[in-house]
């Protein structure tokens, strides 16, 4: 006599949607919009019909996945949580690392799926720059440009380092980018009357 396995605990619609969204993101990066509901169901460990009970359609699921991945709020919270007591170099390295991970994730999804989902706005970019400036604020007197301008530079360099066709050649690591941001490519300028 065989024993029937116990039925899985019932999840709320939101929990089920979250579980499916967790499963679909890597599949979207790998297969783009051609990912099948069968692949999604297998990856999530659910029946195909469960997808349609949670999202009504594959298009709704893909849109929800893109919206979730492009939502800037979780990323903002990560940046806001950076310890202001860390030395400046460690804070900049942490910002570079978080930004590169975020940009790489967004680029991978956009490459695989296209421009589906919420558009990037200048308001979001400005909010991000202000947040980066806030993380830099404890070292305001050490900065050679204002904190918002410094935030723009960090974001710009992290963005450029995250675009595969811009970074032809060996990849930069976070330490190299941090040094470039903080010290440039020639270091500190020599004062005009300094002995050689």
Task: State what each model feature region is.
Residues 1-43, 60:
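Basic, helix-initiating cap at the start of DNA-binding domains
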Residues 1-15, 74, 143, 190-196:
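N-terminal intrinsically disordered/low-complexity leader segments
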Residues 13, 17, 66, 121-129:
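Amphipathic, non-transmembrane alpha-helical scaffold segments
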Residues 28, 55, 62-69, 106:
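Alpha-helical DNA-contacting segments of helix-turn-helix folds
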Residues 29-35, 67-88:
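Short, flexible, glycine-rich and Lys/Arg-enriched loop motifs at helix boundaries
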Residues 45-55:
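Short hydrophobic/aromatic patch on the recognition helix
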Residues 77-105, 154:
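Hydrophobic alpha-helical connector segments
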Residues 90, 101-111, 117-152, 163, ...:
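Amphipathic alpha-helical packing segments from all-alpha helical-bundle domains
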